[in-house]
Amino acid sequence: MSEQNTPNGTADLFKKAWRGFQGAKWTDEVNVREFIQNNYTQYDGNEDFLAAPTEATDKLWGRLQELQKEERKKGGVLECETEVVSSLTSYGPGYIDESLKELETIVGLQTDKPLKRAFMPYGGIKMAEEAAETYGYKVNEKFHKIFTEYHKTHNQAVFDAYTPEMKAARHCHIVTGLPDTYGRGRIVGDYRRVALYGIDFLIEEKKKDLDLCGNGAMYDEIIRQREEIAEQIRALKGMKEMAKIYGYDISGPATNAKEAIQWLYFGYLAAVKTQNGAAMSVGRISTFIDIYVNRDLEEGTLTESQAQELIDHMTMKFRMVKFARIPSYNQLFSGDPVWATLEVAGLGQDGRHMVTKTDFRFLHTLENMGPSPEPNLTVLYSSRLPENFKKYAAKISVDTSSIQYENDDVMRPIWGDDYSICCCVSATQTGKEMQFFGARANLAKCLLYAINGGTDEPYMTKDGKPMQVGPEYAPITSEYLDYNEVMHKYDLMMDWLAGIYVNILNLIQYMHDKYYYEAAEMALIDTDVRRTFATGIAGFSHVVDSLSAIKYAKVKVVRDENGMASSFITEGDFPRYGNDDDRADDIAVWLLKTFLKKVKKYHTYRNSEATTSILTITSNVVYGKATGALPDGRAAFTPFAPGATPSYGAEQSGLLASLNSVAKLPYEYALDGISNTETIAPGALGHSEDERKNNLVHVLDGYFDQGAHHLNVNVFGLDKLKDAMEHPEKPEYANFTIRVSGYAVKFIDLTREQQLDVIARTCHEAM
């Protein structure tokens, strides 16, 4: 680093911090990718080097598990804050246990106590109050006055601006799960920057950006950007003060592995202290951390046991992140997820694999401390990854059902080799981009609107008539559905849905920027940021199968007293998505492409790039409860299949045929992600550990080599699920983790309704 670029003349500190590191470009500008590419060490070996948990890890994890049991006994929340608004510096230091604090190698809690939920009213005071009251806590009444009379919240602003049509669409769940009652999340700060450069350098870089912003010309875009940069600088200064509370000075760069992990974690802690976004991803940190660990190992200042302890303790902190949520949120996103998504592996653009020993160490946390939903461990997969790593990851999947896989070979050409997963399955260039999260549009209900002329079957007006939510097009009145007529009307109704959906999201994102801006996260992202506009699809497989039924069989309409199509009788057989049958799978591809094209016709906020996803989280239950019967045979008000997963029971040709169908969906039309969740009986993979992990590797290689995007892998039988549902008190189920649509969850933390939904899903007994 040149002397003039060094803040406060601290060249010696940077020299010490960067000793032995290679490369030049990253030393004069913020460029973490360049640093990684010049300094990481590939690892081709197996897991034999890994260390068992230390005594400190066992004691801390044991205490944390006791707290988690207390939390479960109290209905899912151990304690809620009622007197302090969460901020970077609103609390003194907090530890897992005051008597054990000397054992914590990585420190920092969201509040002053472990698992205590912060009070975060900026997204909506009513939501913050309701979240506390749900668990028996009462927020100090002064805050209601402050955040209704003196400080407007995001939620109030959105509902002030909603049109009656938007409110009706939201009420009837044709668009649903919207981030208007919770933080939008999905913004990943490049937390590595805190460790590599220190806060002072980052502040100086942001000050340069502020000086260059606008050149004296003041108009809306420039004014807003100047204000946002100023907020980012303020947030960076706040991070320094937050770290001081724990006795650390993060003004300069980290000088060893322990500091690098601690500095990085402070950056993430700043995010979760100030935002309660639906997804608060950690990002792609493993390779970065490995560089520091390797240097310390080579210098003899760190042992493998100590290195694993640092990773275990950091992971323990990610497992502790909690937010106070309202009941309607928990119905959408069940099981208390945070989406602290953390990626391992992948390939570089130069063809080198990026597997390091620390990738193994992060996966090993699931052995040292048992299965856990958080962090949301994600393997960036390619068949070209080292065989030893693929087999170890497969072993962890078979043993824990806690990790997911995403296809690095389809993401890398678009996002480069330094992207993070910003929620469940969505990629974003680390430190270069941010995403406007937009939940999902209910394309299954949209199909019913096309048949019923825009009226909603479950939702009635005050006089008992079906609500007119969509355009008042002529309904289909024939006894049997005609494929061409249905497709024409469905095309028109999707036009309307795409338009209102995008406009609702434009409004929400505008208000979130205005009233609940993510300054701490955006401070760790380039000022000249690229923005994506993430839409989503719910009910995907049911629409595909319904259109297939109309095209290839005969579908008779059963109408109620209002003339609404309330159920359907299908005569004859039809191809179903999930069986590697192009007749159905081609409809799936058409549906995805068509919806994205319609979304892209509309203006998106801040000139963001529109994308879409096929992803539902556990909200497939909520969406299904709001949607009537469909021509594919799905009964009214029952759960949808999640994400891009084929409908329950539709897969009749085994696991591989199901995977082949999903693999046909083109990722370039769903850059926000295509989520596929499969459950495999252990015996279907083999009769020994070696057979199972080797066969799973073959499945993953074949699936992803076809261009598929994502796979959740569960390896267990239905009997285990049923027993866990009936006997959640059994010790073996305390940390029983399963993969659902895009994330993992402790099975016993799901509602019974959602547990039954998981049990109803296809469990493949054969390949």
Please provide the spans of the model-predicted regions.
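Conserved catalytic cores of very large enzyme subunits
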Residues: 2-767
